[in-house]
From Swiss-Prot:
GO CC aspect terms: cytoplasm
Enzyme Commission code: 1.2.1.41
Species of the source: Hahella chejuensis (strain KCTC 2396)
Coiled coil: none
Nucleotidyltransferase in keyword set: no
Name of the protein in its database record: Gamma-glutamyl phosphate reductase
Cited function: Catalyzes the NADPH-dependent reduction of L-glutamate 5-phosphate into L-glutamate 5-semialdehyde and phosphate. The product spontaneously undergoes cyclization to form 1-pyrroline-5-carboxylate.
A GO molecular-function descriptor: glutamate-5-semialdehyde dehydrogenase activity
């Protein structure tokens, strides 16, 4: 297969489809989403059979247990895909919304209209349910989509793609609105991220290596985050009961997510009081502690933290702990070592909370809440295509609105500029 020619054809079809889906009304888009859900429900056996092929290949190729778990399509995960499609169909359609319309001294009205981005390329690994999540959000926001899943999920993704095509057909939309790349050749990724004539934005979802490569080589804008090095800072003015529950939940509710706390910062005046309680709670959960020298004076059972620990995304039951002198040191540490993802302060001081919100340079900053809330669903977005730590266009969880941009609209009645 000539990968360059194949990807150019896919891109050309996506560009044409983007003009159709951009002007599709909400009812048509919702019809496609519901029909896709019905097609998935009717194709459960086919989906499970295709997934079984991928799992068999994965085991033969030595995929570890975590990757195999992400790859597996269980009945519950199929149920979740169906539920997700219905949820996206129920979300308000952002396309065409006009905001900020106001009269200017000249008599014209000026406002902003929300419009689709155009063609969105999604590159992801392992999890076949991302195929449905990404396709549904792009479809509802009026974008055409090119999906390139991991080679380990090729059979699952193609089976899901057939269901999506069925849903599009039912709604009278062309299959090219959502295209799933049919080759496992890695050269397809290189082509996809270097086609600015056909692709408007790339959203990578996967490991740090994949995202670094795409960020380095892409010739189209990328919506991404590299790491989730999230912090909780327990201030001297914190309610220590709140601090205990927030610090435990932020770390142990789930270990493998990008919004899990990886470093705990504790204000020196409360360290001797709160750290032993936290250590006991973490021990019950099997969490390994790595602390600075001052932490180890209080918790001698903790391992010695090294410089690399402060910027490490463990995605595991491991936690770095540092005792800091004050809020200034906590903010400086977060801005230096953090990944600009999600950081929280536990404090009863209004002024310190406001300083934290203002000075911590992250896409989500929190007061007295677990970092695990950094999620599109929890933020009321309904669903998310990913989380961005960039500052341009989308920042934080990216939902339907993040898959659109705005253009100015000007309304006049024969007005001319004097």
């Amino acid at each position: 297969m000539d990968i360059n020619a194949y990807m150019r054809e896919v891109g050309s079809e996506a560009r044409s489809a983007s003009r159709l889906i951009a002007k599709a009304d909400t009812g048509v888009k919702n019809k496609a989403l519901i029909a896709t859900a019905e097609a998935i429900d009717a194709a459960r056996e086919e989906l499970m059979a295709a997934n079984a092929k991928d799992l068999e290949s994965g085991r033969a190729n030595g995929l570890d247990a975590a990757l195999l778990d992400r790859l597996e399509l269980t009945p519950a995960r199929i149920d979740a895909m169906i539920k997700g499609l219905h949820q996206v169909a129920a979300l308000p359609d952002p396309v065409g919304e006009i905001t900020g319309l106001n009269y200017r001294p000249s008599g014209i009205q000026v406002g902003k209209m929300r419009v689709p981005l155009g063609v969105v390329g999604i590159i992801y690994e392992s999890r076949p349910n991302v195929t449905v999540e990404a396709a549904s959000l792009c479809l509802k926001s009026g974008n055409a989509t090119i999906l390139r899943g991991g080679s380990e999920a090729i059979h699952s993704n193609q089976a899901i793609a057939a269901c999506i095509e069925n849903g599009l057909k039912t709604a009278g939309l062309p299959a090219s609105v959502v295209q799933v790349i049919k080759t496992t050749d890695r050269a397809a990724v290189g082509e996809l991220i270097t086609m600015p004539d056909y692709v408007d934005v790339i959203v990578p979802r996967g490991g740090k290596g994949l995202i670094e490569r795409i960020s380095r080589e892409a010739r189209v804008p990328v919506i991404k985050h590299l790491d989730g090095v999230c912090h909780v800072f327990i201030d001297r003015d914190a309610d220590l009961n709140k601090a205990l529950t927030i610090a435990v939940n932020s770390k142990t509710q789930r270990y493998g997510t990008c919004n899990t706390m990886e470093t705990l910062l504790v204000d020196a005046p409360v360290a001797a009081t709160i750290l032993p309680q936290l250590a006991q709670a973490y021990a019950e959960k099997g969490v390994e502690l790595r602390g600075c020298e001052r932490t180890r004076e209080i918790l001698p059972q903790a391992l010695s933290a090294v410089e690399a620990d402060w910027s490490e995304e463990y995605l595991a039951p491991i936690l770095a702990i540092k005792v800091v002198e004050n809020l200034d040191e906590a903010i400086a540490h977060i801005n230096h070592y953090g990944s600009h993802h999600t950081d929280a302060i536990v404090t009863e001081s209004y002024s310190k909370g406001r300083r934290f919100l203002t000075e911590v340079d992250s896409s989500s900053v929190m007061i007295n809440a677990s970092t695990r809330f950094a999620d599109g669903f929890e933020y009321g977005l309904g669903a998310e295509i990913g989380i961005s730590t960039d500052k341009i266009h989308a920042r934080g969880p990216v939902g339907l609105e993040g898959l659109t941009s705005q253009k100015y609209v000007v309304l006049g009645d024969g007005h001319i500029r004097q």
